[in-house]
Structures are given as C-alpha cells and as structure tokens.
C-alpha cells in the first residue's frame, strides 16, 4: 500500500510529501503511520477526483460550446445519421492521427448538435482539449488580430488543441 500512496503523491506532484511518506515508512510501519494510512488514501482519492472535475469544468468553459449537447439527446431514429459511426467517432481517436471529420447536411439536420456532442464526449471521457468556433466568429477574430498587429496568437492557441470544431462553414 505504501507504493500506492507514494505513487499517488507523485502523480499529484506532491514530491515533498512522497519523500516524507517514504521516510516515515522506511523503518517499518509504526502503529501511528498504519492508523493514518486509510485517511491519507481517502484524502488522495478526494484530491485526485477534485482535480479531474476541475479540469473537465475548465476544458468545458475553454471550449466555448454554444450549448451543452450530448449523444443521449440526439434522436438517431429521426435522422439518417449512421449511429454506429457516430458512436465510433465519440472516442475522438481520429484526432490522434490528425484526421478530419466533416458533417454535411441541410439546416436543422443536427450537425451542430453532433459536433458539440462528440466534442463534449472528448472533454469529459477522454480528456481532450477542444475549441468550438462559429466560422464567422473565427474569421472576425483573425481579422481583429491582424488589425491589432498581433498575428499568430489564435493559430498558436488552436495548435495546442486536440480538436477544433468549425461550425456554420456555409455562412462565410
């Protein structure tokens, strides 16, 4: 169990505490250390869970989704969309090979819903960094950046993302 606590402390970047824990347990566990071990394990688990939730919350805000959508809310029965393909895409494995996904269809067919739902799945289940843009908003931001003589900042920001969603491409 000591290895688990030490590993957990290091994974939380608490290296000083990991070293102190190792020193405390080096000479064999005393009754005092053993009695506090369960508390430390629970605190580490709580901290790990809290950090994960805060990270997801931060990534969701950073993504700037127009609305929160998920795949459970999409009516596959009323659509011609291939449900199996969408579920396969929901793990965002296509981002590892830098492949693109293009959703094509008329107004009201669920393109934005699906793009948002796939992105939300990436953030919440696969720790992906996502940025959602209306294409018009992105073009306006790039123009503003150019006028301010600060070109390249948006491009650098987008390069750090695992997935960039460009919505409403047809309205350009």
Describe these PLM feature segments.
Residues 10, 14-66:
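Interdomain "pre-motor" coupling segment immediately N-terminal to P-loop NTPase/helicase cores
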Residues 165:
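SF2 helicase catalytic motif II
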Residues 6, 22-23, 100-102:
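Helix-rich C-terminal "collar"/helical-bundle subdomain used as an assembly and partner-interaction module
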Residues 12-15, 24-27, 46, 50, ...:
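Conserved, well-folded catalytic cores of nucleic-acid-processing
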Residues 69-90:
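N-terminal pre-Walker A segment at the start of P-loop NTPase domains
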Residues 84-160:
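Conserved P-loop
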Residues 168-169:
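Walker B catalytic acidic pair
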Residues 1-7, 124:
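Intrinsically disordered, low-complexity and often Lys/Arg-enriched segments
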């Amino acid at each position: 169990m000591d290895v688990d606590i030490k590993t957990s402390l290091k994974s939380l970047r608490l290296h000083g505490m990991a070293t102190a824990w190792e020193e405390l347990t080096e000479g064999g566990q005393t009754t005092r250390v053993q009695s506090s071990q369960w508390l430390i394990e629970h605190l580490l688990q709580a901290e790990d869970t809290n950090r994960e939730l805060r990270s997801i919350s931060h990534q969701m805000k950073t993504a700037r989704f127009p609305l929160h959508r998920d795949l459970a809310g999409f009516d596959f029965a009323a659509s011609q969309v291939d449900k199996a393909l969408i579920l396969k895409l929901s793990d965002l494995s296509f981002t590892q090979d830098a492949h693109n996904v293009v959703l094509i269809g008329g107004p009201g067919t669920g393109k934005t819903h699906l793009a948002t739902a796939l992105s939300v799945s990436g953030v919440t289940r696969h720790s992906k960094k996502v940025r959602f843009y209306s294409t018009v908003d992105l073009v306006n931001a790039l123009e503003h950046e150019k006028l301010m003589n600060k070109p390249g900042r948006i491009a650098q920001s987008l390069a750090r993302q695992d997935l960039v969603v460009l919505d409403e491409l047809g309205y350009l």
